[in-house]
Amino acid sequence: MKAVCVISGGMDSSTAAFIAKEQGYEILALHFDYNQRTMKKERECFNLICDDLGVKSREILDVSFIAQIGANSLTDKNLTIQKTGVKSGEIPNTYVPFRNGIFLSVAAAFAEKEGADALFIGVVEEDSSGYPDCSENFIKKIESAINAGTSPNFKLEIKIPLVHLSKTQIVKKALEIGVPLEHTWSCYEREDKACGFCDSCRLRLKGFKGADTKDTIPYI
């Protein structure tokens, strides 16, 4: 069995990839560069996680056209990354329009070429920033569209093992299956030391606190 794993270098996608390995899949690792602020750090963490997994097949794809579309603070440095938390029902300016839809479409093409059985992505719906392309409903619908638009001899299952877990549950699961969380990066803003205040840092720290364990990556 082969699975394409979309790995950003973050905690969630890395844990999803380790789950794929635990389930016996041969991992085809896929990473996307889209000129985000922390692109170099994320790429570094992707390679570290691939080394930890013993992955031989790894691809880094340039989808920098996402930055040309803009409309988000991850790629547009003229926008300030929100650090005040996210209110219920609010979509923060760190939301990259249809990013996961783009990633999954490209990953599906790669999976079809490679004859993969599954595609793992670490989306989280329950304890997240509220991005619409991280919901189970969206994933199921794009899975249906992918299978309608690819070869009849190809059927892809998109696996989202973390979608209904809290950040605390994700940290606990990661520790249970041996994910080296010190090799992952979550900060939206910085590559040297995590800011500790962007929504992604807040959620990460919340998970570690709930799991009663220390996050060993550097913070300012």
From Swiss-Prot:
Q: Which cofactor does it need?
A: Zn(2+)
Which of UniProt's keywords are assigned here? ATP-binding, Ligase, Metal-binding, Nucleotide-binding, Queuosine biosynthesis, Zinc
Does Nucleotide-binding show up as a keyword for this record?
Answer: yes
What's noted on cofactor binding?
Answer: Binds 1 zinc ion per subunit.
Task: Name the pathway.
Answer: Purine metabolism; 7-cyano-7-deazaguanine biosynthesis
Reactions accelerated catalytically = 7-carboxy-7-deazaguanine + NH4(+) + ATP = 7-cyano-7-deazaguanine + ADP + phosphate + H2O + H(+)
Instruction: Please tell me where ATP binds in this chain.
Output: I7, S8, G9, G10, M11, D12, S13, S14, T15, A16, A17
Q: Where does Zn(2+) bind?
A: C187, C195, C198, C201
Which InterPro entries does the record match to this protein? QueC, Rossmann-like_a/b/a_fold
The protein's Enzyme Commission number: 6.3.4.20
Q: Which GO terms describe its biological process?
A: queuosine biosynthetic process
GO molecular function per UniProt: ATP binding; ligase activity, forming carbon-nitrogen bonds; zinc ion binding
For this protein, the record's SUPFAM superfamilies field holds: Adenine nucleotide alpha hydrolases-like
Which NCBIfam families does the record associate with it? 7-cyano-7-deazaguanine synthase QueC
HAMAP family referenced in this protein's UniProt entry, alphabetically? QueC
| Record's function text | Catalyzes the ATP-dependent conversion of 7-carboxy-7-deazaguanine (CDG) to 7-cyano-7-deazaguanine (preQ(0)).
Query: According to its UniProt record, which protein family does this protein belong to?
Result: Belongs to the QueC family.
Q: What is this protein called?
A: 7-cyano-7-deazaguanine synthase
Q: Which organism is it from?
A: Campylobacter hominis (strain ATCC BAA-381 / DSM 21671 / CCUG 45161 / LMG 19568 / NCTC 13146 / CH001A)
